[in-house]
């Protein structure tokens, strides 16, 4: 039995997995850098408000700059987690139907969490 290496090489080159993999890799790195920058803001915010009352902290959170940074932090962290969970699911789940279902569930969970967070931020007292 002779194994056809040429057919396998052509098959692997014709699939666009390398392009999507590079894009996925780049997205993970970009979201990681954004999260690192946002974590500096979060650490600064925690240290500057460590002795304040909860009402003062909530008032600080309602400033537009802090709301925007907080929304960016939560959204990017959830998107970063979706990217990571997708890699884990694709690597360890062999059944295609289950794999696709789990990826959709993870994406929906993160979308619902982002929407709930936005509603909680803008509709809090």
From Swiss-Prot:
Q: What is its main location?
A: membrane
Where in or outside the cell is it found?
Answer: Cell inner membrane
Q: Which domain of life is it from?
A: Bacteria
Secretion signal, residue range per the UniProt entry: none
Chain residues that bind a ubiquinone: 92
InterPro entries documented for this protein = SQR/QFR_C/D, Succ_DH_anchor, SuccDH_FuR_B_TM-su
Regarding the membrane, this protein is recorded as:
Multi-pass membrane protein
Q: Which GO terms describe its molecular function?
A: electron transfer activity; heme binding; metal ion binding
> Single Gene Ontology BP term?
cytochrome complex assembly
Cofactor requirements of the protein: heme
Which regions of this chain are Cytoplasmic-facing, per the record's topological domains?
1-24, 90-99
Q: Which residues bind heme?
A: 80
State whether it acts alone or in a complex, and with which partners, per the record.
Part of an enzyme complex containing four subunits: a flavoprotein, an iron-sulfur protein, plus two membrane-anchoring proteins, SdhC and SdhD.
Instruction: Report the protein's function.
Output: Membrane-anchoring subunit of succinate dehydrogenase (SDH).
Q: What name goes with this protein?
A: Succinate dehydrogenase hydrophobic membrane anchor subunit
**What gene is it encoded by?**
sdhD
């Amino acid at each position: 039995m002779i194994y056809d290496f040429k057919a396998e090489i052509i098959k692997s080159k014709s699939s666009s997995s390398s392009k999507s993999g590079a894009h996925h890799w780049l997205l993970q790195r970009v979201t990681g850098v954004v999260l690192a920058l946002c974590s500096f803001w979060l650490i600064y915010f925690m240290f500057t408000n460590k002795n304040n009352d909860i009402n003062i902290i909530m008032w600080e959170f309602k400033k537009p700059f802090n709301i925007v940074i907080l929304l960016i932090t939560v959204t990017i962290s959830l998107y970063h987690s979706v990217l990571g969970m997708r890699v884990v699911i694709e690597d360890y789940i062999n059944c295609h139907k289950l794999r696709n279902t789990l990826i959709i569930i993870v994406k929906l969970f993160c979308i619902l969490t982002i929407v709930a967070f936005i509603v909680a931020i803008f509709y809090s007292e």
